[in-house]
């Protein structure tokens, strides 16, 4: 990885990695802190093979977009995705919603973020852009038991209110450009690779 981490930006200005991460995400919904997640899986865990296949029809299926090595050069998102609402990410704490050519996305991505949506229900882009959630650090999210084991803290409001959390914002809604050959991001939430490494 040292070679990739130190690659000349003239050779490749956007580097992406595949990682499996579990972020401790919370969102305040109707005045109450609730656990949420970046996932296209059915919230009840009852995903079937057909639903999984449909979810992956567009995009390769990754949820992290590549890190840009040098500003002012090729930008993976700007080069390959049109901005439909909001802004392209400016910070690693900005996440985006990816939609397909019909401006639809994976409904489970929205349900898993606490949006109350039904199949085929239309929701305005402006109702999504600007949504904020907290990324809780492990020290706030987990409680140590007398046995030495750790379990998730049951007081989600205290976890949500912890000043050491990082606030994330859905900054924009993007759609793959017709001219793009780099349709890597599946419909749903996409975030900077840098977010998953901090």
Protein language model annotation of sequence segments:
Residues 1-198:
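Basic-flanked hydrophobic alpha-helices used for secretion and membrane insertion
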């Amino acid at each position: 990885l040292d070679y990739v981490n130190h690659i000349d930006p003239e050779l490749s200005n956007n580097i992406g990695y595949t990682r499996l991460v579990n972020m401790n995400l919370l969102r305040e919904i109707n005045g109450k802190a609730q656990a949420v997640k970046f996932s296209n899986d059915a919230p009840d865990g009852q995903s079937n093979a057909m639903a999984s296949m449909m979810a992956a029809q567009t995009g390769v299926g990754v949820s992290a977009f590549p890190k840009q090595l040098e500003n002012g050069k090729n930008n993976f998102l700007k080069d390959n995705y049109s901005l439909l609402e909001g802004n392209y990410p400016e910070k690693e704490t900005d996440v985006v919603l990816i939609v397909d050519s019909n401006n639809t996305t994976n409904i489970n991505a929205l349900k898993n973020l606490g949006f109350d949506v039904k199949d085929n229900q239309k929701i305005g882009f402006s109702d999504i852009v600007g949504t904020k959630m907290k990324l809780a650090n492990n020290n706030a999210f987990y409680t140590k038991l007398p046995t030495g084991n750790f379990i998730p803290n049951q007081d989600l409001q205290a976890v949500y209110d912890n000043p050491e959390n990082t606030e994330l914002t859905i900054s924009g809604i993007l759609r793959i450009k017709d001219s793009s050959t780099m349709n890597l991001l599946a419909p749903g939430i996409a975030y900077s690779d840098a977010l998953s490494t901090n």
